[in-house]
A protein has these predicted regions:
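Juxtamembrane intracellular "pre-TM" segments in multi-pass secondary transporters
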Residues: 2-17, 206-235
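Intracellular juxtamembrane helix-capping segments at the cytosolic ends
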Residues: 125-138, 332-345
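Glycine-rich segments within core transmembrane alpha-helices of 12-TM secondary carriers
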Residues: 148-165, 358-368
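Cytoplasmic membrane-interface "Motif A"-like loop-to-helix N-cap segments
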Residues: 79-91, 289-300
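C-terminal ends and interior cores of transmembrane alpha-helices
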Residues: 92-106, 302-314
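Helix-to-loop junctions at the C-terminal end of transmembrane segments
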Residues: 69-82, 169, 280-292, 376
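Symmetry-related core transmembrane helices of the 12-TM Major Facilitator Superfamily/SLC fold
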Residues: 182-200, 383-401
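Helix-loop boundary and gating motifs at the non-cytosolic
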Residues: 8-64, 232-236, 240-258, 266-269
Length: 415
């Protein structure tokens, strides 16, 4: 009987890993689409005539819209226990928004805002439920390495997406124009369709991913309890969001203004940052399973100087170093922050916990996006110093969260 039990566990673990990999490939094509668009979005918005204050405000408003609604959709996912419908609907809205950017006419930046925000809406609908489904499977193999694998494959797509855009610009062989941007957005519709096709395949093959994790209670959704460790963790994430630009738009604009590289090659810089992102996600994700949130503190400290290197420097090599620092922060946070929520929450409230965390993150990103825009207009020193101080403060809070989490975790009883 014991042998059968071990075989069942092995089979369950293999199925869980297959599901994680399949969802990671879905994310690969999703990021290929989204990051390909992100690599030129700042320049596209500038070409359409969008003012700088609107550029940063839309980035923050998108974060606010997406993250504030994630709490609601996270609650609904947990309450109904129907995670897949939210994932499917969210991905459909998300993926169709990028090719629609090809329909924006000259000086039509207001219409572009609609499609940008609709993409954020799609993410809000899908993200808590999708993260919850992956976290259920991750309990079989370890949260850190599971989310790290997903983030690494994400970033393969994030590297390829900008290369697609670069190829479109190179093949047209003319000065960057609205037509080139439209063609690029249309080509990104191909990976968008691949993403949706694979997602439907995942739904058919794994209709109940929540069965990968054993339930801690018999009843349905329980009271949403915020532990001290989770509260400090969310506070750390919110402070990190104050100064860490998770959008490439402002960095893109600043590099473009400095003229250190031709506009057509800007996506290559973004692709490089996403490559660093992938390596960072793998390294710090695996490290998370060994040392917990200390890994996140290390990663955030490594990303702290990116403001001085990108905004404060005017040489290409300094910008490369700055984007390396920025990529480390993006990769570590994308994998370890997701792992952290899974570690600090119960199965029954997993999607709601993701929604709450991302609400804190999004409100902070939106609230301080105007300050970031103001500091950028004032001086490179002002924005760089603000970035440094907020990231260092967040790293301290992540260390505190790890200490509290250890204190809250029951020690195993020795027989």
């Amino acid at each position: 009987m014991k042998r059968v039990s071990e075989q069942d566990k092995s089979s369950m673990a293999q199925a869980a890993m297959s599901f994680i990999v399949l969802m990671a490939v879905v994310s690969l094509f999703n990021d290929m689409t989204f990051e390909g668009a992100s690599s030129i979005l700042g320049a596209y918005e500038t070409l359409l005539g969008m003012p700088t204050v609107w550029l940063t405000a839309i980035s923050g408003a998108g974060a606010l819209l997406g993250c504030s609604l994630r709490m609601l959709f996270g609650y609904l996912s947990d309450k109904t226990g129907k995670y897949w419908p939210f994932v499917l609907i969210g991905y459909e809205i998300d993926m169709i928004s990028v090719p629609l950017l090809a329909l924006v006419p000259e000086n039509g930046w207001a219409l572009a805002v609609v499609f940008i925000l609709s993409e954020k809406l799609g993410k809000a609908i899908k993200k808590p439920a999708k993260s919850a489904l992956v976290s259920f499977a991750a309990k079989q193999k370890g949260e850190g390495k599971s989310f790290a694998l997903g983030e690494a494959l994400d970033q393969i797509g994030a590297c390829v997406g900008p290369l697609i855009v670069t190829a479109v610009f190179a093949c047209t062989k003319s000065e960057p124009s609205l037509r080139q941007y439209h063609l690029a957005f249309l080509f990104l519709g191909v990976p968008a369709l691949a993403c949706l096709g694979l997602l439907i395949t995942a739904r058919i093959r794994y209709p109940k991913p929540e069965n990968f994790e054993r339930s801690e209670r018999k009843e349905g959704i329980g009271r949403f309890k915020i532990t001290p460790a989770f509260l400090v963790f969310c506070l750390g994430g919110a402070i990190f969001a104050m100064g860490f630009l998770d959008s490439f738009s402002l960095l893109n604009k600043d590099i473009l203004i400095k003229g250190v590289i031709d506009e057509g090659y800007l996506p290559l810089l973004y692709s490089y940052a996403m490559f660093i992102d992938a390596l960072s996600a793998l390294f710090f994700g695996f490290l998370y399973d060994k040392i917990g949130f200390y890994s996140l503190a290390i990663a955030t400290l490594l990303s702290a100087p990116y403001g001085f290197l990108v905004f404060g420097a005017s040489t290409l090599w300094a910008i490369f170093v700055g984007l390396t620092s920025w990529g480390i922060g993006i990769g570590a946070c994308e994998s370890v922050l997701l792992s952290g929520v899974a570690s600090l929450s119960s199965k029954e409230n997993r999607a709601r916990s993701y929604g709450f965390f991302e609400l804190c993150y999004g409100l902070s990103a939106f609230g301080f996006s105007f300050l970031i825009a103001y500091l950028y207009e004032q001086s490179s020193l002002a924005i760089s110093l603000f970035i440094l101080l907020t990231i260092v403060a967040s790293s301290i809070l992540f260390i505190v969260a790890e200490v509290l989490h250890k204190a809250e975790t029951p020690k195993p009883i020795k027989e």
